[in-house]
Structure formats: structure tokens, C-alpha cells
A protein has these predicted regions:
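Helix-turn-helix
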Residues: 1-26, 30-31
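A conserved beta-strand->loop->alpha-helix hinge within the catalytic CA
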Residues: 5, 51-56, 123-126
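Short amphipathic alpha-helical segment with a characteristic S/N-K-E followed by hydrophobic residues
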Residues: 23-28, 38, 90, 94
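Hydrophobic/aromatic residues within well-ordered alpha-helical segments
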Residues: 24, 31, 35-36, 60, ...
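Amphipathic alpha-helical linker/stalk segments
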Residues: 29-60, 68, 72, 111
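Short amphipathic alpha-helical interaction/hinge segments
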Residues: 32-35, 39-43, 72, 88, ...
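Amphipathic alpha-helical packing segments from all-alpha helical-bundle domains
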Residues: 55, 66-67, 71, 75, ...
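C-terminal peripheral helix-coil segments that are non-catalytic and often amphipathic
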Residues: 59, 63, 100, 104, ...
Length: 173
């Protein structure tokens, strides 16, 4: 997409777009950050005092599952995979704008859960990576390949509950 097309879609001049975003990469990163912030706000990774750890993890898993299953996220994932071989910086921009921020939030939450004695986690970053990989799992792989639709309703809820159960059993005190 050209900056002309972005300006036309936004109903502003190209100069206005460039005054906010110096190039397409900056615009792309801003869009990814905004989407992640809406679906997985920073507040989601702040551990509410006295909340059961499984409920906190379920809330995060539900939001993440909804994000990765959205039509926009599926299209973006496919685009990044296709463009990555042509321009690796495209994937790097995406990672910095979205997944890295989400991982940092989850890492901090898990570090806090460990310090409170709620879970036993030696490496919170690695545990955060495992958590999100479990949520994605085979259903996301099938979705990206076009072999299946997104998990919805009871099926999505059963999936995230199973993931959280596995995660808690792996890291219980």
C-alpha cells in the first residue's frame, strides 16, 4: 500500500500522513502497536491483588486467542511470512511493535507471580514464550494454513482452559 492510498483511505493529504509517520515502516509499527494495545492492553498484565492466578491467565489467554484468530491478524501473519523472505526487516518491525511488547508484559506478570509464591518460574521470559505458544498451538497453525477456521465459542474456551491448566501444572509451587 502506498502512502497515497493511506492518505486517501484516511481522507487526509499525503503531507498530513507524513507529518505523523515518516515512512511506511513507522505507520505499520504504529498500526500494530495500536491493535495490540486494544486487544492486549498493558493493564491486562498487571496482576490484581488477591486474584486467582488461573483467572488472570485465562483472561490473557482469551484475549490473545481472540487477537490471533481475528481475520486481520491471520491476514497480517500470512503477509509477514510471505514478505519475510523478501525483506526480513518487515518481520523485525512487526516483532518489535507487537509480540515483543506482549512478551515483556507477560514476563513481568509471571515474574511477579513467582515473587508472590503463586508459581515457580525460573525464567519468566521463557515461560511467557511457552504460554503464548501453547495458546497458539495446532489450531492457529491450521488456521494460518487455511485448513480450519478460527476457534470460537465453547471450542475456544475449552482450548484456553486446557492451555492454562497445562501451564499451571508445569509451573505450580
Amino acid at each position: 500500500t502506498s502512502m497515497d492510498a493511506v492518505a486517501a483511505a484516511a481522507g487526509v493529504s499525503k503531507l498530513t500522513v507524513y507529518s505523523h509517520f515518516t515512512d511506511k515502516q513507522t505507520l505499520f509499527c504504529s498500526a500494530v502497536m495500536a491493535t495490540c494495545q486494544i486487544q492486549l492492553p498493558d493493564l491486562l498484565f498487571e496482576y490484581p491483588e488477591g486474584a486467582p492466578v488461573d483467572e488472570v491467565l485465562l483472561t490473557i489467554a482469551r484475549n490473545f486467542q481472540a487477537l490471533i484468530s481475528s481475520d486481520e491478524a491471520v491476514k497480517l501473519s500470512r503477509l509477514i511470512m510471505a514478505q519475510g523472505s523478501l525483506d526480513p526487516s518487515f518481520g523485525e518491525y512487526f516483532y518489535e511493535a507487537g509480540p515483543k511488547r506482549v512478551l515483556a508484559g507477560m514476563e513481568a506478570l509471571l515474574r511477579g507471580a513467582n515473587e508472590r509464591g503463586l508459581l515457580r518460574i525460573d525464567n519468566p521470559l521463557r515461560a511467557a514464550e511457552h504460554f503464548f505458544c501453547l495458546v497458539k498451538g495446532a489450531p492457529d497453525y491450521r488456521l494460518l494454513l487455511g485448513c480450519a477456521g478460527p476457534l470460537e465459542g465453547d471450542e475456544a474456551e475449552a482450548h484456553v482452559r486446557e492451555v492454562v491448566g497445562v501451564f499451571i501444572r508445569a509451573f505450580h509451587r
